Amino acid sequence: GSRAPMTVELSPKIVTVMTREDIQRSAAQTINDVLKLATGVDVRQRGGFGVQTDISINGGTFDQIAIFLNGVNISNPQAGHNASDFPVALADIDHVEIIEGASSRVFGTSAFNGAINIVTKKASANGVEANVEAGSFGSLGAQGRLQMAFRSGKWEQAYSVSGGYKRSDGGTENSGFEKGQGYANLSLSYDRRLDIGAQLGIASQSYGANTFYSAKFNNQYEKTDHGIASLNVSVHNQGRTWEVTPAVYYNKFKDHYQLTRGK
């Protein structure tokens, strides 16, 4: 295996691509809902709306997959339980690529059973999106996205920024949650020979972890924070018969757990 560009038809592994049209038809509310639709992917949620989710492929464990955002590894090296702390919202996503089968040689040791790559939308025009939702048990959510696209000579520029918030008191004891995320993306292209991409994302959530880790304790609590940043450059000819792609990225998690809430 290699990271060389390749079509789905030529790939030696099973590759599933969930397009934006697939996502819209599915009526999914979270990224986890989208992943549930893929054959071979097992998604097990302990809480509602994507709160702490175990994601596995082909019968493996949640620690045996690698998760990428626009090709940047955002997996949690500490615990796969928090792999679903995505710094992007469903509205940001263009498509999701799922590779089934051992991929450690290409994507690192965590990709023992496969890999998931979330690809965000690239702005092609100026636009604004916003939505607000409310429901029972004190549920409330809001999401907004701003995008801009410009062309100046041989330069193409695309910018997008988004943010979201969701909370609920929960339908059972100690099952409430509060979560938020923010994401920004920059894309520059010159004459189909140079591409520069940068992204910055944060996600934070706190929730009642009722019997998450032990049935004896129903007043558990957990708070997680996830931050990512990356910069990548691609230098290539117009036919992309050769390509050089240096990249740097930052990926940090913080996890605070209380066996008994408030103690």
Give the ranges of each region predicted by the language model.
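N-terminal periplasmic "start-of-domain" segments of outer-membrane beta-barrel proteins
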Residues: 1-24, 54, 183
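Non-catalytic regulatory/gating segments with a bias toward low-complexity or hydrophobic composition
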Residues: 23, 35, 96-97, 116-118
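Extracytoplasmic beta-strand/coil segments of soluble accessory domains associated
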Residues: 32, 36-76, 94
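Membrane-embedded beta-strand positions of outer-membrane beta-barrel proteins
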Residues: 35, 116, 128-132, 159-163, ...
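Short acidic/polar hinge/loop motifs at secondary-structure boundaries
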Residues: 54, 72-100, 118-121
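Outer-membrane beta-barrel channels and translocator barrels
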Residues: 62, 123, 151-155, 189-193, ...
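Short strand-turn segments of transmembrane beta-barrel domains in outer membranes
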Residues: 115, 120-150, 162-163, 168-175, ...
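Flexible loop and strand-edge segments within Gram-negative outer membrane beta-barrel domains
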Residues: 168-175, 179, 193-244, 250-263
